[in-house]
């Protein structure tokens, strides 16, 4: 429980620190979001390397996504992804109905615009993990009602 609280506090301070140290132009053109996503990317690479060192090779892309949704998500956020959908053409949607990094925020509509800065790190986390498993991807997040969110993973074919 204590490690969970520390992760939430660290994440909030990280977001706050990036936005406080930014100049006005950086906030407006999305550089803060990019910084947070790049931090998540590096952390995701490191975590996946550590989590998969003793596991067998994955058969395919779907197996990798299942690993992300079950094992990886459980280790980082203490629960599995609630729903994984795919069109079997390289697009996956991961839905978390009670995303831990958004549960501390109020559920009002006025807070939806601020949700993106709290999701950027996680988008990078997913992208970094997939990158270390040999999958190049684009990860975006969407929130329609707090604290539920959807992460869309678009696999880029080489």
Curated annotation (Swiss-Prot):
It is linked to Neurodevelopmental disorder with microcephaly, epilepsy, and brain atrophy: An autosomal recessive neurodevelopmental disorder characterized by microcephaly, global developmental delay, hypotonia, intellectual disability, autistic features such as poor social interaction, language impairment and repetitive automatism behaviors, and generalized tonic-clonic seizures. Brain imaging shows cortical atrophy, thin corpus callosum, and cerebellar and brainstem atrophy. Both isoforms are expressed ubiquitously (at transcript level), isoform 1 being the most predominant. Expressed in the fetal brain and different regions of the adult brain and spinal cord. This is Trafficking protein particle complex subunit 6B. GO terms for biological process: endoplasmic reticulum to Golgi vesicle-mediated transport; nervous system development; vesicle coating; vesicle tethering. Belongs to the TRAPP small subunits family. BET3 subfamily. Disulfide bonds: none annotated. SUPFAM superfamilies: Ligand-binding domain in the NO signalling and Golgi transport. One of its GO terms (cellular component) is trans-Golgi network. Keywords: Disease variant, Endoplasmic reticulum, Epilepsy, Golgi apparatus, Intellectual disability, Neurogenesis.
């Amino acid at each position: 429980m204590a490690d969970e609280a520390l992760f939430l506090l660290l994440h909030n301070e990280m977001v706050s620190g990036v936005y406080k140290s930014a100049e006005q132009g950086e906030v407006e053109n999305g550089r803060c979001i990019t910084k947070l996503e790049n931090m998540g990317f590096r952390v995701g690479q490191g975590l996946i390397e550590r989590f998969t060192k003793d596991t067998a090779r994955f058969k395919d892309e779907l197996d990798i996504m299942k690993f992300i949704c079950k094992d990886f998500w459980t280790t980082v956020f203490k629960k599995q992804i609630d729903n994984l959908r795919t069109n079997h053409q390289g697009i996956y949607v991961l839905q978390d109905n009670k995303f831990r990094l958004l549960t501390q925020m109020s559920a009002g509509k006025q807070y939806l615009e601020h949700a993106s800065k709290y999701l950027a790190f996680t988008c990078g986390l997913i992208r970094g993990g997939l990158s270390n498993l040999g999958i190049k991807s684009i990860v975006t997040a969407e929130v329609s009602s707090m604290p539920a969110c959807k992460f869309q993973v678009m696999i880029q074919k080489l």
